């Protein structure tokens, strides 16, 4: 999965390394962080676009995010698509949850 900053800049390191750098930078600047993860999808005529985001919120000071986009040509109903959204969010959360525990950063996974 290719991760990008909201600006479109591609992340060349692993998302785990990028999130750790962000946590260190933001906590050194005095911010308490919270991470929110979610996935949404949009059905097109020939495929479905999925976007998973990792949002780092600075308590009372805005935030920033990383986004990974994927396309699927599989035909699926809304229930299957929603379950796939939840799966992508949970997989992303599992990939960084140990890091968040180390730095005592709260995690929220959106499953809607």
Regions found by a protein language model. Give the residues of each.
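Acidic helix/loop or adjacent segment enriched in Glu/Asp that either coordinates divalent metal
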Residues: 72-102
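Conserved active-site and cofactor/substrate-binding residues in soluble primary-metabolism enzymes
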Residues: 14, 49, 84-87
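Short charge-dense sequence patches
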Residues: 31-47, 72-84
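Short glycine-rich or small-residue beta-strand-to-loop segments that form or flank ligand, phosphate
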Residues: 36-39, 108-112
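Acidic, metal-ligating active-site segments
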Residues: 37-38, 44-68
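Basic, amphipathic N-terminal segments that precede the first structured/catalytic domain
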Residues: 1-36
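Generic structural motif
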Residues: 65, 70-71, 107-109
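Short helix-terminating capping/connector loops at secondary-structure junctions
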Residues: 28-31, 100-106
